[in-house]
Amino acid sequence: MSLILRIVALPALLLGAVLLYAASKPDIFRVERSQNIEAPPEKIFALINNFHNWPLWAPQDREDATMRRAFSGPESGAGAISEWTSSGSAGGGRMAIIESAPGQKIFVQVDFVKPLAAHNINQFTLQPSGHVTRVTWSMQGTNLFMMKFMSVFVNMDRMAGKHFESGLENLKAAAEK
């Protein structure tokens, strides 16, 4: 085999292997983190169920000073909508509360527009136990090929998980005041 053919074939084989590995990743992804908060579920629920309260705890609101939000629909609960734009790390998109059970759970449809389009469901569940409420924040969505490819090089669970951990710590601080 000539040297030129080897030089061309090796990178092509490596790229093919990476693409094949990426294609074999699961079609659905899920990220989940939990936090114990010393507050009643009703207090925590109010912080999550109303998008106007998210700047008190949501990491993207705290990390990106260029982020701007617009609200529509009811102030809280099912049908509440928050749209955001940013020239920074938060990108742009829309969130809508699609299910809300007082003191128990909230489902939020999250549609990212930029930097990459994606459609996910965030779920917050609240499980009281004595004076402590266990809050679980999870996100599930379709693992598009671009995300599968990125996950070959970047641990997406760790990256999104840090965001959730920060948000839950902020939520804990806000709820325990």
Locations of regions flagged by a protein language model:
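Hydrophobic-ligand binding "helix-grip"
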Residues: 2-24, 56, 63, 83-134
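Hydrophobic ligand-binding cavity/cleft-lining segments
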Residues: 3-75
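Conserved short-loop catalytic and cofactor-binding motifs
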Residues: 32, 70, 85, 152-155
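Short, acidic/polar N-cap/turn motifs at the starts of alpha helices
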Residues: 32-34, 81, 123
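Extracytoplasmic/secreted envelope proteins and their assembly/folding machinery
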Residues: 41, 45-54, 79, 94, ...
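Sec-exported extracytoplasmic/periplasmic mature domains
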Residues: 49-56, 87, 99-102, 169-176
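Short coil-to-beta transition motif at edge beta-strands of beta-rich domains
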Residues: 76-82
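Beta-strand/loop substructures that line and gate deep hydrophobic ligand-binding cavities in soluble
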Residues: 109-166, 171-174
